[in-house]
Amino acid sequence: MGYLFDTATLAEVLRAVPSRLLVKRLAGVPTSERWTTSITVSQILIAARRTRHPKLMQDVIRLVAAVKVAPFDTLAAQSFAKLRTTVAPEADTDDVMIAAIAVTHDFTLVTRRPNAFRIYPHLRVEDWTL
């Protein structure tokens, strides 16, 4: 169990003035329960590289070090295939991969985009910015 933070949530944390509610909730989660995905890490690294701001890259590296990273492994790939072929044939591939990792590990997905993930059965979704 734990909380899986998606790209939108980690991007919010990296903002100059992040959501106070999100920061407060995040601070209350033990480090052992703070997770993200290898998909999210790649997305925020790409965004940081594109901005070419060294401070943002440093902030991303610090943020990634503060969470555990769940990989897209064989079990997640099996979940992905099931989700893609049953409930999400047209959904964004990265979103389906993130959902598959969350379902595989029984994580609660924390996102600023809950409606994008509500289609997945057995996936708990929360928005900590509200």
Where are these regions (language model features)?
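Acidic, PIN/NYN-like endoribonuclease modules and their adjacent C-terminal/linker elements
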Residues: 1, 99, 103-130
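Short, well-structured N-terminal submotif of metal-dependent ribonuclease cores
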Residues: 1-36, 46-62
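Histidine- and aromatic-rich ligand-binding microenvironments
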Residues: 5-6, 37, 91-92, 113-114
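Generic structural signal for small/hydrophobic residues in well-ordered secondary structure
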Residues: 6-7, 44, 80, 102, ...
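Alpha-helix capping/helix-boundary segments
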Residues: 9-10, 40, 76, 97-98, ...
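Nucleotide phosphate-binding site architecture
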Residues: 10-11, 42-45, 70, 118, ...
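Active-site neighborhoods of divalent-metal-dependent phosphate/nucleic-acid chemistry enzymes
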Residues: 67-112
